[in-house]
A protein has these predicted regions:
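Extended soluble regions of mature proteins
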Residues: 10-185
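Hydrophobic h-region of N-terminal signal peptides that target proteins for export
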Residues: 1-8
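Extracellular/secretory-pathway and virion-surface proteins
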Residues: 165-557
């Protein structure tokens, strides 16, 4: 880090200009100050991450920021700033007869009143300086936000400084803007260009050899898993987003994908999804439907919880790998697909470590290339002494068969049965809701992928939610689907409407409020009007349900 460079105090006087702030002509409890010394205007506090200066000697604005142990500097010449328009009126402020000019910037109007007679020079906003001899005494944004100078004083106890020297890295305006944004939050890389493919020769690691921050491949290569630490940035975040990048490494088809979390084992008698990845499907409890079909690990039971699905996504038809194999004039294929969704309520930040995984169902040797990061955004409005309530996260069911390549059954029970889960709440929960994700599958004309089907949810026998999940916007994502088939009517397969998903998109959950649910034992039921199978072609539904909320003491049985 470059050391701060202090400006000498014994040669040049320092002047402070103080401004009151108003909103809609009402004074608010906030003020602004700028400092002027030796033709330099200091616009920021010494403690601010980004520093801003107006250099009147060299006719430039300078902004600096410390990021990743480096100092970056942006230099903006005065002649590239917004130009002003002279207005007719004048007014007296602090005894100075002030001229009026206006600026137009990004569809905003900024009115400025300034004097050239004051010893101090400058403006509280470096974009709006009428000339280098001006001191702005009043600034009005769009007629309703106002800064008005209330005093100009000489100060003796202020030490202006600049936090750069010749070693600072000069970047352009767009690069500096990127650095500012990146400095405001923390990116936690989870997976980096990992291949998810079908590889039956993958060796399953031994449980006693598993370590934190190492990537493991399971279920014949179709799942990547990693145990990560819940960092202070995650624990203290205001919002957490999962950002997934995906591109084809040889697979041409749209595939089911899921990003999910599984707990680390705390007790020997607790079964987790990791047990099945390590030792096989027999480790998972079995759900048996009315026709004796067996489904492995799909509901919460004593000693077992299904995974917490944080992203439900679908790969596009062959983006990246097939771009040059399916060239069409005026079709500029995407290089990759980026999925990003807020997952704050689903990340167990009161844990020290969790397993996080990505599943893509495919039998292709090339498969797909994925990267995943968690973006943690710090809290801006947290009051001093305020304590965060603990998150309540209780996964109830998931028919997403992340071990499809290990012969885990598809979620096709809804044709002849209702999915029923018993659970118990032992605490008072604030803002309790069920996050319900649902997508229908069966890829022929009469299959549930292409036929709207009713979904209903009942809690303790009372209907709390119903919807026909359906997406009609799939044509929006045509340029992410180079390998999609083109039909004689001009449509592409990726254009077709589907049961709540499109090739190359996320399927966000529905938020179902359950605030009336009290402590005690309950039962939740999911009813889907699943259509009949045709020969070997089967319908199924990928659904997941997680209870979320806030509480002081988590104790769910």
């Amino acid at each position: 880090m470059f050391p701060f460079v202090l400006i000498a105090q014994n040669k040049f006087d320092v002047y402070k200009v103080s401004y009151d702030q108003y909103e809609n002509e009402k004074k608010i409890n906030r003020s602004t100050e700028i400092f002027f010394q030796n033709q330099i205007v200091f616009l920021t506090k010494n403690s601010d991450k980004m520093q801003q200066y107006i250099d009147l000697k060299n006719n430039v604005n300078i902004s600096t920021i410390a990021f990743e142990d480096k100092i970056f500097k942006k230099i903006i010449p005065f002649d590239s700033l917004p130009s002003s328009k002279k207005e007719d009126d004048t007014r007296v402020i602090l005894g100075y007869n002030c001229e009026h000019v206006s600026f137009s910037y990004f569809s905003n109007r900024i009115d400025i009143w300034y004097t050239e007679k004051a010893i101090a020079k400058g403006t509280p906003n470096s974009n709006y300086l009428p000339n280098k001899n001006a001191l702005v005494l009043k600034m009005v944004y769009n007629g309703n936000q106002t800064l008005v100078a209330n005093a100009i004083t000489k100060v003796k106890n202020y030490q202006p400084f600049v936090n750069y020297n010749d070693g600072a890295i000069v970047v352009d305006k767009s690069e500096f803007e990127e650095i500012i944004i990146n400095s405001r939050y923390k990116k936690l890389a989870i997976f980096d260009n990992e291949i998810i493919n079908f590889d039956p020769n993958r060796t399953i690691p031994k449980e006693n050899e598993l370590v934190t921050d190492k990537v493991y491949h399971f279920s014949n290569g179709s799942v990547v898993l990693k145990k990560i630490k819940i960092t202070p940035e995650l624990k203290n975040s205001q919002a957490i987003f999962a950002k997934l990048t995906c591109k084809s490494n040889g697979d041409a088809y749209d595939r089911t994908g899921s990003v999910f979390i599984a707990p680390t084992k705390k007790k020997d008698d607790i079964t987790t999804l990791l047990d099945a990845y390590l030792y096989g499907l027999d480790r998972l409890p079995i759900y048996i439907d009315n026709k004796e079909n067996k489904y492995q690990g799909i509901i919460k039971e004593e000693g077992y919880s299904p995974a917490i699905e944080i992203l439900s996504f679908f790969t596009p038809f062959g983006v990246n790998y097939f771009n040059n194999k399916r060239k069409i004039n005026n079709y500029n294929w995407a290089k990759e697909v980026i999925y990003k969704e807020e997952v704050s309520s689903l990340i167990p930040t009161d844990e020290d470590e969790v397993w996080i995984g990505i599943f893509i169902g495919n039998y292709d040797a090339g498969g797909h290339i994925v990267s995943l990061e968690l973006d943690a955004y710090p809290s801006m409005d947290k009051k001093e002494g305020e304590v965060d309530r603990k998150k309540y996260i209780a996964p109830l069911f998931s028919t997403v068969n992340t071990m499809e390549m290990s012969e885990q059954n598809y979620g096709g029970l809804f044709a002849n049965d209702t999915l029923k889960v018993n659970f118990e709440i032992k605490e008072d929960i604030q803002n309790l809701q069920l996050l319900y994700t649902t997508t229908g599958h069966g890829g022929w004309d009469n299959g549930d992928e292409f036929v709207p089907r009713m979904n209903k949810i009942f809690v303790d026998g009372e209907e709390v939610f119903k919807i026909i999940p359906w997406r009609t916007d799939c044509a929006t994502y045509r340029l992410s689907n180079p390998a999609s088939g083109n039909f004689y009517d001009g449509l592409s397969s990726s254009d077709l409407s589907r049961s709540n998903w499109c090739p190359g998109t996320l399927t966000p959950p529905y938020s179902i409020p359950l605030s009336k649910l009290q402590k005690g034992k309950h039962v939740i039921e999911v009813v889907i009007e699943q259509g009949p199978n045709e020969g070997s072609s089967t319908n199924h539904w990928n659904i997941s349900g997680v209870l979320v909320g806030q509480l002081n003491n988590l104790n769910l049985k």
